[in-house]
C-alpha cells in the first residue's frame, strides 16, 4: 500500500492544490456559501477515492510483487489492467532472453572445456613418450629434462581442473572416501616429485577415517598443497607430514612442512587468484592460481581450508571435513 500511495503522490498533491485553488477562488469571488464549496470538494474527493480504489484493485498484484522482495524468476499474475498485462509480457520476454543467453553461454563454456580437455590430452601424449624415452637415463641433462616435463605435467593438470571448475556441478560425486587411501594415492602420484626435490612425506593416521567428498577433486586440491610444500621445503628440510586427526565432529587433514614459511603480510592473501607474494617473487615458480583453486574446490565440496605459517619455520595447511552427511 505504501508503494501504491507513493506512486500516486503527484495525483494526490494535484487534488490538494486543486482544492486550495477552488477554496481561494470562492473566497476572493465573494462566494461565501461554504456548503456549496464543501459539496464540490466532497464530490472531487469521492471521485479521487474511487479512482484510487479502482487502480488499486486492478494493479494490486504489481504492488504486492514489487513489495514482497521474492527471489527467483517466476512472475506471478499481476492483474487485469493494460499496464499489468504489458508489464507481465515484458518481464516474460526478458526472462526468455536471459534463458537464451544463459544457454548460449553454457554451450560456449562446454565447447571451451571440451577443447581444453582434448588439447591437454594431446599434449600429454608426447610428454608420456618423452618420459618413456628418458626414464632409464641418469645423466644430468636428462634429469633436467625430467624435471621440466614434470613441471609441464603439473601445469597441464592445473589448467585442466581450472577449466572444469566452471562446470563443477556436473562433474562431482559425493561418496564415502577413505582418507588414508586417498593420501596414499596422492603420495603414489607424486613420488617422482618427492625424489626430485628430496623431500619425503610421512603419514600419521591413527584410524581409517571415512569422509564424504569427491575423491578426484579433493585429490587434486591436496596435490596442489603438497607440491607447494615440497617446492618451498627443498634445500631447507626433507620433512613433510600428512597428519590426520579428529576435532569434535570433524576430521582434519594437516599438511605440514618445515620450509621457508610465508611472510605475515602475505598470509591473508594466499587464496587470492594470481597472488604470488614474496615467495613467488623469490622462487619464481608460483603462478598464484594453485591455492585459489584449492579454496574454490573446498568451498564447493563444503569443506574448509585454512593456513598458518611462521617465516623460516614452515607452513601448515589444514583441511576440515564433516564425518557425517
From Swiss-Prot:
UniProt KW Kinase keyword: yes
Keywords carried by this UniProt record: ATP-binding, Cell membrane, Kinase, Membrane, Nucleotide-binding, Phosphoprotein, Transferase, Transmembrane, Transmembrane helix, Two-component regulatory system
SUPFAM superfamilies named among the record's database cross-references: ATPase domain of HSP90 chaperone/DNA topoisomerase II/histidine kinase
InterPro entries assigned: 2-comp_sensor_kinase, HATPase_C_sf, His_kinase_dom, Sig_transdc_His_kin-like_C
Origin superkingdom: Bacteria
Topological type in the membrane: Multi-pass membrane protein
A Pfam family matched in the record: HATPase_c
Location in the cell: Cell membrane
Record domain Histidine kinase: where: 118-325
Protein's UniProt keywords contain Transferase: yes
Reactions performed catalytically: ATP + protein L-histidine = ADP + protein N-phospho-L-histidine
GO biological process, one term: phosphorelay signal transduction system
Residue list for modification Phosphohistidine: 121
Cytoplasmic side: 1-8, 55-325
Positions of transmembrane segments: 9-29, 34-54
GO molecular function: ATP binding; protein histidine kinase activity
GO cellular component labels: plasma membrane
Extracellular compartment segments: 30-33
Listed EC numbers: 2.7.13.3
Biological function: Probable member of the two-component regulatory system YxdK/YxdJ. May activate YxdJ in response to the antibacterial protein LL-37.
Protein name, UniProt field: Sensor histidine kinase YxdK
Species of the source: Bacillus subtilis (strain 168)
Amino acid at each position: 500500500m505504501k508503494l501504491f500511495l507513493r506512486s500516486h503522490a503527484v495525483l494526490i498533491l494535484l487534488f490538494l492544490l486543486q482544492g486550495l485553488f477552488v477554496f481561494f477562488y470562492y473566497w476572493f469571488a465573494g462566494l461565501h456559501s461554504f456548503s456549496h464549496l464543501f459539496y464540490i470538494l466532497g464530490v472531487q474527493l469521492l471521485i479521487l477515492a474511487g479512482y484510487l480504489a479502482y487502480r488499486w484493485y486492478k494493479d494490486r498484484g504489481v504492488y504486492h510483487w514489487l513489495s514482497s522482495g521474492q527471489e527467483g524468476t517466476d512472475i506471478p499474475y499481476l492483474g487485469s489492467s493494460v499496464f499489468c498485462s504489458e508489464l507481465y509480457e515484458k518481464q516474460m520476454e526478458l526472462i526468455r532472453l536471459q534463458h537464451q543467453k544463459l544457454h548460449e553461454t553454457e554451450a560456449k563454456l562446454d565447447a571451451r572445456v571440451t577443447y581444453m580437455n582434448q588439447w591437454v590430452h594431446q599434449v600429454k601424449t608426447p610428454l608420456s613418450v618423452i618420459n618413456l624415452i628418458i626414464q632409464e637415463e641418469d645423466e644430468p641433462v636428462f634429469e633436467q629434462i625430467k624435471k621440466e616435463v614434470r613441471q609441464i605435467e603439473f601445469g597441464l593438470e592445473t589448467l585442466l581442473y581450472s577449466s572444469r571448475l566452471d562446470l563443477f556441478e556436473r562433474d562431482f560425486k559425493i561418496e564415502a572416501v577413505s582418507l588414508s587411501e586417498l593420501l596414499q594415492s596422492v603420495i603414489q602420484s607424486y613420488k617422482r616429485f618427492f625424489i626430485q626435490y628430496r623431500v619425503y612425506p610421512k603419514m600419521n593416521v591413527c584410524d581409517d577415517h571415512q569422509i564424504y567428498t569427491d575423491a578426484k577433486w579433493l585429490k587434486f586440491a591436496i596435490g596442489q598443497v603438497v607440491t607447494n610444500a615440497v617446492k618451498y621445503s627443498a634445500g631447507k628440510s626433507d620433512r613433510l607430514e600428512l597428519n590426520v586427526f579428529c576435532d569434535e565432529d570433524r576430521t582434519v587433514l594437516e599438511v605440514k612442512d618445515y620450509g621457508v614459511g610465508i611472510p605475515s603480510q602475505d598470509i591473508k592473501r594466499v587464496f587470492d587468484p594470481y597472488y604470488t607474494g614474496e615467495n613467488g617473487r623469490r622462487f619464481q615458480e608460483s603462478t598464484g592460481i594453485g591455492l585459489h583453486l584449492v579454496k574454490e574446490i573446498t568451498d564447493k565440496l563444503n569443506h574448509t581450508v585454512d593456513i598458518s605459517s611462521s617465516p623460516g619455520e614452515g607452513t601448515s595447511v589444514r583441511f576440515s571435513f564433516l564425518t557425517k552427511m
